[in-house]
Amino acid sequence: MRDEDNNKLILKRKSKLALLREVGNPFINNFKPENLAQNIIQEFKGFSKEELEKKNMQVSIAGRMMLKRVMGKVSFVHVQDSSGKIQLFVTCDKLPESFYNEQFKKWDIGDIIGAIGILFKTNMGELSIRIDDIKLLTKSLRPLPGKFHGLSDQEIRYRQRYVDLIMNKTSRNTFKRRSQIINYIRNFFNHHDFIEVETPMLQTIPGGATAKPFETYHNALDMPMYFRISPELYLKRLIIGGMNKVFEINRNFRNEGLSTRHNPEFTMIEFYQAYGTYHDLMNLTEKLFRSIALDVCGSANVYYQGNNLDFFKSFKRISVVDSILQYNPSLIATDLNQKNAKQTAEKLGIQIKENWGLGKIQIEIFETTVEEKLLQPTFITEYPTEVSPLARRNDDNPFITDRFELFISGCEIANGFSELNDAQDQAERFKKQVEEKDLGNDESMYYDADYIRALEYGMPPTAGEGIGIDRLVMLFTDSPSIRDVILFPHMRAEVK
């Protein structure tokens, strides 16, 4: 619809609103619906026309008017509430004198109404409500998108989510499913004896991940602060304090780019288990994902963007190096060693920075040639120590850590490891991160002296993991973009 036409309709609706104000309040707030459309349909759809007439069942409903057909003294209206739609049958003889012509006919699609009436079935067999009383609860001034074209512009859907939710059942179902998944995850960890906690969103030192933070300033304390990039270091402080199993579901903030898989503000669950290993967490994660598929989606086989993801089978487990060799059959193990890795990467078209060590080069090769090919649930293990500043070194090979990442449909969904609890080793790794930051890497970590102090009190052997809730919801709702599963995703400034 052109802006000019839209503005004309808005002016017309404002004129109707002025007339409605003269005869009453077009924003009534004392109507209490007792029924939902979908509940009514589920309970009474099996009744015959005669059975409904005998039952004389009165219901009351409130919602948005999505269709209105005036046929003289009779009108048909479709009302949509949070559960679905139902048809209303409105006749002038059931309403107060002159109400039908002077008020009801001035109502528009998009208005919010409340109605009381008796259930019946039309001659076509559609379950409907024969109205005894109907009220305007909110007059809508902006017209909804046309019923045939709906709201198809993706950018408008993201910017005006309120309209998207009105018009698109798929969007409504996506966010209902998101809520179900988060509740399921919370119950899953409660059932496994984890304690839910809350840690600071504003931090004096942003830690727990390699990412660029958002900065702010605390006026009363007269100090710079940062929106957290991860709760990890605070959750591990709780492990040190004796809380052996903790989890947190909350927002993280990373001052990075936008993509179909990245939003600067996103939801994660992080959880930590004392006396556990990264193997324990892989087992727990596999159980969690399989349970979500079965209990929330109804099947261990979940279709995502045309691919059948099998959550019933045991998830594949393979190391970083072995996965590179598997998906690059022309390479051999020595192509990835200290002597040859840089040349191998350059042959693959990867630009190498001078300060990169072997571990960073191997990860770049992995991300370039392997990551997007990991369709089925796969744990990638044995990440290099160089790119794992908070993970425990492997006992047999200090070049690698006891770390994994879970990939599904070519996307990283989870990251976990046995935690580094050697305070001296952690201090040295923090120092290396600071050196990288001084060289211009603004995603490197800060030195967190208080966390080192906490580690010096002793942290028990611990494993921890973070799972991206938004990406997980993408999988279980078949959503191609992270913006489809975040109610109000970040967008570039709107061009007026």
Curated annotation (Swiss-Prot):
It is found in: Cytoplasm. Pfam families: tRNA-synt_2, tRNA_anti-codon. Binds 3 Mg(2+) ions per subunit. GO terms for biological process: lysyl-tRNA aminoacylation. One of its GO terms (molecular function) is lysine-tRNA ligase activity. One of its GO terms (cellular component) is cytosol. Mg(2+) 2 binds at residue 412. InterPro entries: Aa-tRNA-synt_II, aa-tRNA-synth_II, aa-tRNA-synth_II/BPL/LPL, Lys-tRNA-ligase_II, Lys-tRNA-ligase_II_N, Lys-tRNA-synth_II_C, NA-bd_OB-fold, NA-bd_OB_tRNA. It catalyses: tRNA(Lys) + L-lysine + ATP = L-lysyl-tRNA(Lys) + AMP + diphosphate. Its main location: cytoplasm. Belongs to the class-II aminoacyl-tRNA synthetase family. Homodimer. This is Lysine--tRNA ligase. It comes from Vesicomyosocius okutanii subsp. Calyptogena okutanii (strain HA).
